[in-house]
Amino acid sequence: MHAAQARLERRQALRHGSLLPHAPQTVGFFCMDVSFISATLVLPAVVAALAPEGSRWAGDAVILVKPQFEAGREHVGKGGIVRDPAAQQLAVDRVEAAVRGLEGEALALIDSPILGMEGNREFLLHARFA
């Protein structure tokens, strides 16, 4: 019971940025792999936490895009699998839109060499923020 509660608090804290209040200002790269929440909800908090006060963060990121958390419940099939390539692309499009919304640029996308839990196809997105 306590472990699940701790994970929920941690997830909630990360989404709202309070997990990163003392992040070093010299960070030029981050890698993000989140579960049970959309990367689009966490990304703004991470970018804001890494930004020097009064300015924007500049650097590169690799974001693991997990369609089962990005495409919407209506696209998730039995066992939590997103099988439809159009739904997988929708998931990627949503994360790329979140990057652009933070004045970033999606530079490259590859299939993750590791399948997600239950065999989901996942993607690695290289983004740059300037």
Residue spans for each PLM region:
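Short, glycine-/aromatic-enriched active-site segment of Class I SAM-dependent methyltransferases
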Residues: 67-84
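S-adenosyl-L-methionine
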Residues: 1-42
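A short glycine-rich, Lys/Arg-flanked "PGG" loop and its adjoining helix->strand segment in the class I
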Residues: 40-62
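Conserved S-adenosyl-L-methionine
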Residues: 104-115
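Short alpha-helix
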Residues: 88-102
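Non-cysteine beta-strand/loop elements that form the S-adenosyl-L-methionine
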Residues: 11, 61-69
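Core SAM-dependent methyltransferase catalytic element
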Residues: 114-130
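Short "lid" loop at the C-terminus of a central beta-strand within the Rossmann-like core
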Residues: 16-17, 67-71, 114
